[in-house]
Amino acid sequence: MRVAIAGAGLAGLSCAKYLADAGHTPIVYERRDVLGGKVAAWKDEDGDWYETGLHIFFGAYPNMLQLFKELNIEDRLQWKSHSMIFNQPTKPGTYSRFDFPDIPAPINGVAAILSNNDMLTWEEKIKFGLGLLPAMIRGQSYVEEMDQYSWTEWLRKQNIPERVNDEVFIAMAKALNFIDPDEISATVVLTALNRFLQEKKGSMMAFLDGAPPERLCQPIVEHVQARGGDVLLNAPLKEFVLNDDSSVQAFRIAGIKGQEEQLIEADAYVSALPVDPLKLLLPDAWKAMPYFQQLDGLQGVPVINIHLWFDRKLTDIDHLLFSRSPLLSVYADMSNTCREYEDPDRSMLELVFAPAKDWIGRSDEDILAATMAEIEKLFPQHFSGENPARLRKYKIVKTPLSVYKATPGRQQYRPDQASPIANFFLTGDYTMQRYLASMEGAVLSGKLTAQAIIARQDELQRRSSGRPLAASQA
């Protein structure tokens, strides 16, 4: 079968990869001139990369890790020590660690929590552990039921002290979905905790050894092309052209950069667009369908990614750091953590600015000033005295609508990958799969979409038999 896919983010590329593996011919159409969607990156005038986000790969990402294995690029993951490292706001410039020993789960997670005496008291640890028991015993069904509560509401329901939220979960909620624990669904945090506690290396983290478009997305493209498929850039989806029965007749691809507008016909069609632009493109004939109406309950969350190049080393820590700043989420010195960005003498900090709803419309200068004020608290030793560290340059990447905002009650709005339109499918981390808004969720959704298309293969081929499948000029 020939399958047209709109969007070359991880979900669209994953879908194409697994369709190609099954002997089908996926053609991916990407609006921009760069691969990756939410993992896109660009080079500046000096040849330095700047990215859409700070992308972390966890041991609890089975589909992502399987993808790396199938592409034979596992060596591109740079695994870090099995730890979680938090800044201590009351002791600027110092850190508190949760170190996971090399013993089976969940004992290693329990040991990591119990051995940290900087952030939680013994009473808080015990109450937190008791509060988690229902999730650990009842598993995913309980985790899904808790979507009715925010994380803060769930903590109170379980009689877990507020200070546990302040010390640990403000930072974790911002890392998971770029919002505070008062807003994030308990399902999101419990899903992460369940994976971290039930899998020995679930919370172990890796960085990619370079920019995602080159080091992860391009190998997928080459894999697809080697099997007869293709990925085309500068090819934005303009319209779903429908048949009389509301099925898809063609993708209308806009003509940009001197290209002609095209009508793309295929046996099956996939939207791998984020949920917000997809809603803008929905044909009137589909808008009354409950399946598509549920998308109105989903909306992307704003996030800002910041890159700061300094004239000296600010830290030698080769790991992700939880800032515990009111403005910043996680950060890392990419000159330590990423092989391609390595610099033994100068730091390049990449930081996630979240929650960003009050800042996404502000100027880059305002955002930089606020960020630098926080940086001076994180690294006070480098910004005092006669020779303070100097910022050489910076890049700020704003994403007004990133992954779907995982507030309570969102699970009911997440659609299945197979739509009620016989030849139309959705893929993306917002579709229903257990890994929520994440790179793992995107890859898994792509795989599930490919499986859904293959399951409808006979029907799809019957529908399109006798019809030319080539592209034509509109």
Curated annotation (Swiss-Prot):
Q: List the disulfide bonds.
A: none
GO cellular component labels: plasma membrane
Q: Tell me its family.
A: Belongs to the carotenoid/retinoid oxidoreductase family.
Function as written in the Swiss-Prot or TrEMBL entry: Also active with phytofluene and 1,2-epoxyphytoene as substrates.
Database matches in PANTHER family: 15-CIS-PHYTOENE DESATURASE, CHLOROPLASTIC_CHROMOPLASTIC (PTHR42923:SF45), PROTOPORPHYRINOGEN OXIDASE (PTHR42923)
Q: What is the lineage of its organism?
A: Bacteria, Bacillati, Cyanobacteriota, Cyanophyceae, Synechococcales
Q: What is its main location?
A: membrane
Pathway annotation: Carotenoid biosynthesis; lycopene biosynthesis
Describe what happens upon changing V403G: In strain: NZF4; confers resistance to the herbicide norflurazon
Q: Known activity regulation? A: Inhibited by the herbicide norflurazon in a non-competitive way.
Question: Which EC number(s) does the record attach to this protein?
Answer: 1.3.5.5
The protein depicted here goes by the name: 15-cis-phytoene desaturase
- Reaction it catalyzes: 2 a plastoquinone + 15-cis-phytoene = 9,9',15-tri-cis-zeta-carotene + 2 a plastoquinol
UniProt key word Disulfide bond: no
InterPro entries tied to this protein: Amino_oxidase, FAD/NAD-bd_sf, Phytoene_desaturase, Zeta_carotene_desat/Oxidored
Q: Does the keyword Cell membrane apply?
A: yes
Something else the entry says is: Can also use NAD(+) and NADP(+) as electron acceptor under anaerobic conditions.
**Its topology with respect to the membrane?**
Peripheral membrane protein
Gene source species: Synechococcus elongatus (strain ATCC 33912 / PCC 7942 / FACHB-805) (Anacystis nidulans R2)
A GO BP annotation:
carotenoid biosynthetic process
Q: Which UniProt keywords apply?
A: Carotenoid biosynthesis, Cell membrane, Herbicide resistance, Membrane, NAD, Oxidoreductase
Per UniProt, what is one GO molecular function of this protein?
phytoene dehydrogenase activity
The cellular location(s) given in this protein's UniProt record come to: Cell membrane
**Protein induction:** Up-regulated by light.
